[in-house]
Amino acid sequence: MADPKGFLTTGREVARTRPVEERVRDWNEVYVPGALLPVISKQAGRCMDCGIPFCHNGCPLGNLIPEWNDYAWRGDWRAASERLHATNNFPEFTGRLCPAPCESACVLGINQDPVTIKNVEVTIVDKAWEAGDVTPQPPERLSGKTVAVIGSGPAGLAAAQQLTRAGHTVAVYERADRIGGLLRYGIPEFKMEKRHINRRIEQMRAEGTKFRTEVEIGRDVDAAKLRGRYDAVVVAAGATTSRDLPVPGRELRGIHFAMEYLPVANKVQEGDYVAPTISAEGKHVVVIGGGDTGADCVGTAHRQGAASVTQLEIMPRPGEERSVGQPWPTFPMLYKVTSAHEEGGERVYSVSTTHFEGDEEGRVQWLHLVEVEFRDGKPEQKPGTERRIPAQLVTLAMGFTGTDRANGLVEQLGLELDARGNVARDESYATNVPGVFVAGDAGRGQSLIVWAIAEGRSAARAVDRYLTGASTLPAPIRPTDRALAV
């Protein structure tokens, strides 16, 4: 184990963010580089070698958390990296973007602050890159089998890397102009700089994975013909259909889905645009949706120079501590203040948008809302609470409803969907079409990055078995597995 008394003698410390007045002037990551290095070994030493490490249960990847905590405490960073990469293809992604359900399940968290697992994870992998310990792992021999992966988000990349390393010839198809999917254009630079994606792509290229950008399967290439060219296909196209808000005034200019707004800001950072085509500069911004995507819109609006930012959520404000209905080790829905919220803006809970109001030129100017209260699980408007707030830019960040059907991919392959609009699959990630598998949000629905990577790894094993009759690849989860909850 790590330090036998660490959890008794050392308090929890988390990564420190840069001052607000500094970071809102740039798009760099909000955390101070290397801020935890002097204390990270002691933080890893707080891991208490509990009899049953529930952090394993909280993490769908099955990360070997006590093991790499022990190595980090001892200063054996190469061994820590090896154990970390044994279960996770991209720990620098999860270490920056995952909400850390492993920490919610940490046994120490029953009566103390949990171990800073996420901070230890990202420190291990960053040090591994700096030391040159992250290298390509090309296969020893090729199988002669070919696989097409549709989509280059975390699920697609994980599946592609696992299958390439198993000896198959893999091509990843991405409809955008760069590889990365949601990681590339949906995650702001201040949460994860894209250099982390770029170096992983170079690693994968060196291993033999092929990438095809600006190719939309179903529109540019017939999906059925693609299936005929490859021995297997993995659909990892995500759940990209945004939930809309069909209220009067929705057609006004200045109202955008979050996934219209955020990619434009990211393209500016990539150097594609001098200035964003959708900008919050000098505007009163309203973000509808209280989740992480909404917070990303808030932080982006701050950096673009918004006059004001208001985030609306129809649900009541969550509590700050676990309730009896969210006991340990479940992943609780708690009130949290992200780095974007630290930077300013107002958060309003228990409200519903009734309609938008525009000017004579058809541009949105006001958002009308009303307070709601829930009865029998349904929101009911409270009479007399109607009001309007200025809104010159509105972003809709209310989640996603399923995989994209507009490009013809689903129909051309003849894929069946489940009741939630996701691609249906069996216990082996196989769809109703022989040789076609599905991984990530396309099959699971909107979820977390850690689940996407776990699905990509698990689907890769299923594909490997389909192609060769057996597989030594790991499969951390089944398609029906869900987060530990009540």
Regions found by a protein language model. Give the residues of each.
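Ferredoxin-type iron-sulfur electron-transfer modules in oxidoreductases and energy-metabolism complexes
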Residues: 23-43, 63-96, 100, 111-141, ...
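N-terminal Rossmann-like FAD-binding beta1-loop-alpha1 element of flavoenzymes
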Residues: 146-171, 293-304
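FAD-site-proximal beta/loop scaffold in flavoenzymes
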Residues: 251-282, 375-446
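A conserved FAD-binding loop/helix module that cradles the flavin
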Residues: 294-299, 304, 439-473
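Active-site-proximal substrate-binding core of FAD-dependent oxidoreductases
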Residues: 320-323, 444, 464-486
